[in-house]
Every structure is written in C-alpha cells, then in structure tokens.
Amino acid sequence: MIEIKDVGKIFGDTKVLENISLDIKEGEVFGIIGRSGAGKSTLLRCLNGLENYDEGSIKVMDKEVKDLNNIELRKLRKDMGMIFQGFNIMNSKNIYDNVALPLQVWKKDKKYIDEKVRELLKLVGLENKAKSYPRELSGGQKQRVAIARALTMEPKVLLCDEATSALDPETTKSILKLIQKINKELKITVVVVTHQMEVIKEICNRIALIDGRKVSAYGEVKDLFLRPEGELKKIIEQEELLPNEGVNIKLFFPSNASQQSVITSMARELNVDFSIVWGKLESFRKEVLGSLIINIEEDKKVAICEYLNKKSILWEVI
C-alpha cells in the first residue's frame, strides 16, 4: 500500500532523513518511533504531501507522491485521514459542524452529511455531544472528534501524529481501542508516529525506529521488543545491571512457551542451581510474551544451553 524507498529530506543545510526504506502493508497498524527530532513526523507528512522529499520515492496506492499535481494531491489526501496531538478542531463550531466541515468542503449534499456525521459520532462514542462545543469536552473527547472528522471522506489510510501524547494513560488506552476498532471494522491502514512505547506494544503489527536520520530497526513488534538492540534498547530502558561472576543467560518466551514452567523443570531435571536476575511479562496486541535473565555457574553452561535448545526456548548469553 505504501512503498518508501531511499527517501531523503533536507532542511536548509541539514539532512533530516536519509535512505529511508519501508513497506507498509494494506490493513496493518504500522508504528514509526524515535526520539524527539529524529524525523518521524517529517516522514509521516511526506506520505500525504504536506512535506516534500528531496531524494528517493514514496508511492501511496501506486502513486508517486512527488509527481502529483495539486488536484491529484488533493484527491490523495482525501484517501488519507490525519489526526494530530493538538486535535486541530475549531473552537467556534460545535462538534457536529466540526465533523461535517470536510464534507461541506467537498460539497456533499445535506442529507448525506447529516447521515455521515451521526454515523461517525456514534462510532467514536460521541452521539450525545453533537451540539456541544470543544470547550465543554475533555482531551480524549476532543481527539475522538478529530478522529471522526478524519474519517468523513472514508479514507483508506489513517495517519496518527503523536495522537495520544497529550492524553492521560487511561484516556490513551480508550483512544487506542478506538483506533484498533477502526482498523479492524473499517479495514483502514493505520500509520502511527509516537514516542510512547505502550502505544507501539498495544496496537502495532510492525514498527520502524528512526535514529540518526536513518531506519535503525524494522520488523515485527514482539521480535524487536523481546530482543532489542542498539538505540531501541536504550529507548525502552533495558540496559540492565548484571552480575560480574558466572554466566548470564537471557531467555525469551514467545507465544505458548511463556506459560510453561521451564525454569522449575530445568532446575529439577538437571539438578542445578541458578539465580534469577530479573524477568517480566509484556502484552503485545493481547499476546503475552516474556523474558528472563538467569545467572549460572560456568561449568553448568553446556548442560543448560542444551536443555533450552531441546525445549525450543530462545536464549542468548549476555
């Protein structure tokens, strides 16, 4: 659906994106993460032509974005809804009129506008707020208005630029559930830019980490978070303090393996002692995955590693 190849972007004398190559599949929720100033929001805005790119290619639904004229670009943006951290709704208009605005701009008839606005307000849980004004709403409700407005033209792609950054954790969860619902029920491809790791783990299928203008990590969320490397490991704060003596082994428990009593079985069957340094379970789109670090004596390393291989447990010496 979206093909990004060797994209570069320059502001003045500064290169902010370099050799960016990604493939975003139809129907998935794709996350773009990175530290502030990494260029992730700039990349997102290149997808719908809000920003120009200086090098490479961006094809959205088989259309090269930089080759589109103004009319073609307007049609592309019609197929790409967008929501922002700051909501961008008009305080002088009530909720109904805020959602109706794009439909009015595209000169839809009044009956269609009324039906569409009420349908979308129901979808986002604001059917009773049609006549309310933004000042009467919470931050989460304002973002729901923005989401409803972004869906008015029945887009094929929804771009989310730090859409939950201004919200409290509980409200963030409710907005993420709504985005998942939209992705599933309306079959809309979602591209999420965020610095919030919980957002990525909760709704994304795959992610790309932008660091130093380039993509430094790219793949399935659970794979990258279970075995993070480099900048991603720093971002998710997994730099751990480890014992200096013995051998430290990190175990990974994807899918059903996380439910097995591997550790107690290993201790019993091999008759070995070891220390558990730390462990945790995390949820990735409702799939529970775990990791654990154990410290063992050097002479037990071969037996334990053979046991882990036999049980098909992923592991690495760290």
From Swiss-Prot:
Cell location: Cell membrane
EC number: 7.4.2.11
Main location per the UniProt record: membrane
Pfam families xref list: ABC_tran, NIL
Coiled coil regions, renumbered to chain: none
Membrane topology: Peripheral membrane protein
Keyword Glycoprotein carried by entry: no
A molecular function (GO) term: ABC-type D-methionine transporter activity
Keywords, comma-separated and alphabetical: Amino-acid transport, ATP-binding, Cell membrane, Membrane, Nucleotide-binding, Translocase, Transport
Domain ABC transporter: 2-237
Top-level taxon: Bacteria
UniProt cross-references to InterPro entries, sorted A to Z: AAA+_ATPase (IPR003593), ABC_transporter-like_ATP-bd (IPR003439), ABC_transporter-like_CS (IPR017871), ACT-like_dom_sf (IPR045865), MetN_ABC (IPR041701), MetN_ABC_transporter-like (IPR050086), NIL_domain (IPR018449), P-loop_NTPase (IPR027417)
Catalysed reactions, semicolon-separated: L-methionine(out) + ATP + H2O = L-methionine(in) + ADP + phosphate + H(+); D-methionine(out) + ATP + H2O = D-methionine(in) + ADP + phosphate + H(+)
Any single GO CC term annotated in Swiss-Prot or TrEMBL for this entry: plasma membrane
Signal peptide per UniProt: none
Binding site residues for ATP: 34-41
Protein's job: Part of the ABC transporter complex MetNIQ involved in methionine import. Responsible for energy coupling to the transport system.
PANTHER family (UniProt xref): AMINO ACID IMPORT ATP-BINDING PROTEIN (PTHR43166), METHIONINE IMPORT ATP-BINDING PROTEIN METN (PTHR43166:SF30)
Protein family per UniProt: Belongs to the ABC transporter superfamily. Methionine importer (TC 3.A.1.24) family.
The protein's assembly and partners: The complex is composed of two ATP-binding proteins (MetN), two transmembrane proteins (MetI) and a solute-binding protein (MetQ).
Descriptive protein name: Methionine import ATP-binding protein MetN
Species assigned in the record: Clostridium tetani (strain Massachusetts / E88)
